Amino acid sequence: MATARRFPPQVVRALDATKVLRIRAGSAPHRFIGIWVVVAGGRVFVRSWELAATGWYHTLRREAAGEIQVGTRTLAISARAVRSESVLRRVDEAYAAKYSTPGSVKYVRGLRRGRRRASTTELLPA
């Protein structure tokens, strides 16, 4: 089985340092939106808060493609669902560590439960 492509280390560092990732899911032209992003084990993960049927998460799940903005660069991405409990736990920990301000804690708790946790998606270079 081939291993998944990974983002270059400088991209991973930039994503780890940013609080809000700009993402455009799918192939249809539309605006970029801001979401939280974490890095765990050198891999890049996102979760959906809203889970709207027409939102970025469901579009990304249907098409498994999109773009992210990292600094001044726009990068094509692919996406895959995460089901491994050990990976989900590492992503839980990454969210808790990165978004630890008093105003963020309640959202982190929500992202660590139920459907939001099940929305964990790994972003990969296309």
Regions found by a protein language model. Name each.
Residues 30, 51-125:
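Short, structured beta-strand-loop surface elements
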Residues 41, 125-126:
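A short, structured loop/turn motif at beta-sheet edges
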